Swiss-Prot record:
Protein name (database record): Small ribosomal subunit protein bS6
Family statement: Belongs to the bacterial ribosomal protein bS6 family.
Pfam families: Ribosomal_S6
One of the GO biological process terms: translation
Keyword tags: Ribonucleoprotein, Ribosomal protein, RNA-binding, rRNA-binding
Gene Ontology molecular function terms on file: small ribosomal subunit rRNA binding; structural constituent of ribosome
Function per UniProt: Binds together with bS18 to 16S ribosomal RNA.
Organism classification: Bacteria, Pseudomonadati, Pseudomonadota, Alphaproteobacteria, Hyphomonadales
One Gene Ontology term, aspect cellular component: cytosolic small ribosomal subunit
Taxonomic source organism: Hyphomonas neptunium (strain ATCC 15444)
Amino acid sequence: MALYEHVVITRPDISPAQVESFIEEMTTFLKEKGATVGKTEYWGLRSLAYPIKKQRKGHYSLINIDGPADAIHELERRQRIAEDVMRYMTVRVETLSDEPSPVLSRKERRRD
């Protein structure tokens, strides 16, 4: 099976709890399709580089996936028709890291 990093941007008007619930739904779906879900990260409400669907902010989330391409295609199909999803991107990678992503670690450094 291949390794993927999947980043999704959801609408800013939903709560972080709803975003976590949405990520759980995606995780459950992927497990049903035979994929293994590694690390999931919620990066928070962040400003977008340019407006998407008349929105200037969005909730960013990352999911590491080890699974078949069929599961990824179906996940992307579902996100294309989901109203809460503004953008998504899936990238195939050579290895998955268990360490916090650079985006999340930079966010933690700012708090200190």
